Amino acid sequence: MLKVFRLGYVDFVTKDFEKLSEYYSEIIGFSKTFESHESAYFSSSTDHHNIALHASHFTGIQRIGLQLHADISVQDAAKWLNNEGINTTVKTEARPGVPELAEFTDQDGYIIQLFSSMEVAASGFIRNSIAPNKVGHLSLRVKDAKRSVEFYKLLGFTNTDWIETFFGFMTCNSDHHVLNFCTSPEKAGEMHHLAFELRDYSHLAASLDFLGKHEIPILWGPSRHGAGHNIATYHHDPDGNVIELFTDADVYIRELNRFEP
């Protein structure tokens, strides 16, 4: 079994590169750390990047980056995955700020990249924007949530919660969930939502005011969830991707296999 400890980055393809770039820099408040004529990389604070955008004729999620524990090399991770029958390729200098990664495609077509190190940007938080703490979690539509939960245990994830039998929650650290999987056979391979963690409820309230000022409608919330008990709200980004802003989620204590509020 491998050990990853956080969700490092998420890549999107977009038909409107300029508009989505503006959303992440001006609304979310991430710093642009690298840009080419068809790609842009954004950092929440100190990582080289946490969001990457790529111009395309399509719209949606493209890649997911998970960071390995320091005692596991990219080469060793790739070897282990290949021995498990998961076709994995090692790539060097494949993306800015990440010298080496191991890439495979999961059962639902999501491209997963495992990396052990990333350059530091030290860009800090941007004022006059939402400025989340971090990329909090990613929710994915899959053919079978139970199957996905079992698969991601291979990467060191722990199953922390369920909504009935169709929505499974998993963590690789102290967050209630880092990934979750929603059984949606007809939409498998599409993102359900991407969530950004905020500091506290006052930060969430101020962020809702900020969205209103920029005429971005709220789809739902704020309300407190059952799974994780986070206070959350949702809106669409310019491409129609669902974005969650949340705070006050349960903290997972792995050694005790229980949560603290």
Outline where the language-model segments fall:
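Eukaryotic helix-linker segments that join adjacent hydrophobic helices
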Residues: 65, 71-74, 84
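N-terminal beta-strand motif that seeds the catalytic metal site of vicinal oxygen chelate
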Residues: 1-18, 61-66, 118-146, 161, ...
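Surface-exposed interaction/gating patches
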Residues: 130-208, 212-214
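Vicinal oxygen chelate
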Residues: 78-131, 168-169, 215-261
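Core segments of cupin and vicinal oxygen chelate
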Residues: 2-49, 93-95, 140-177
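Conserved short beta-strand elements that form part of the metal-binding/catalytic scaffold
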Residues: 29-62, 110-118, 162-192, 197-201, ...
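Short amphipathic alpha-helices within nucleic acid-binding modules
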Residues: 72-79, 204-209
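Conserved active-site tyrosine of GNAT-family acetyltransferases
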Residues: 20-25, 81, 109, 148-152, ...
